[in-house]
């Protein structure tokens, strides 16, 4: 299982929180102090909490669990998509649509529409339409791909959420809470840790920090999946004997 050291976190700037005037008092247990009116996160808390989260994500993925990566702010968007693709998982990296989890039935219909449009764009259907109709469908396809492309093959609700910025993604966290889906989240000094099952106190803005978290999670999920495949192979080998 991938682990992250304190040195890695220091180099990535994980310890830099937000300005002291924007703090959430619920984050006090994870704050070391302040420097130049910026809160400093206590990495002696972050390191074990992150590694505990990785261990749990490894267990979930080794049971074929589906992990949904969520990070819709611009700084995290591309990194979230890359990490999810790296470990064959799922992502929402533009806008969280209200009801994405709690109203899955409706979302599923939109995903079906997205897949239908994808087929139409490839099988020549668009070519038979008027220019205006083809343009309208092309725009609809792009819009659906933008919002649902990362979950179109999820095939049902995820088994866990990994969230960059608990404050920014509070709607996603609330929906997961309502459905009993465990939430793993990077929680900065300005955020509310309530509703997060596995709190990872850390900088949620610096791209180096965000890339560090996502890289470790993707590697852990890949390893967890390979454990699952290895145990399946072992079982089939025993059966064959």
UniProtKB/Swiss-Prot annotation:
SUPFAM superfamilies attached to this UniProt entry: Ribosomal protein S2 (SSF52313)
Cellular-component GO terms for this entry: cytosolic small ribosomal subunit
The keyword Membrane is annotated on this UniProt entry: no
Record's keyword annotation contains Cell wall biogenesis/degradation: no
GO biological process, one term: translation
A GO molecular-function annotation: structural constituent of ribosome
InterPro entries xrefs: Ribosomal_uS2, Ribosomal_uS2_bac/mit/plastid, Ribosomal_uS2_CS, Ribosomal_uS2_flav_dom_sf
Pfam families, A to Z: Ribosomal_S2
Keyword field: Ribonucleoprotein, Ribosomal protein
Family to which the UniProt record says this protein belongs: Belongs to the universal ribosomal protein uS2 family.
Name of the protein in question: Small ribosomal subunit protein uS2
Gene name tied to this protein: rpsB
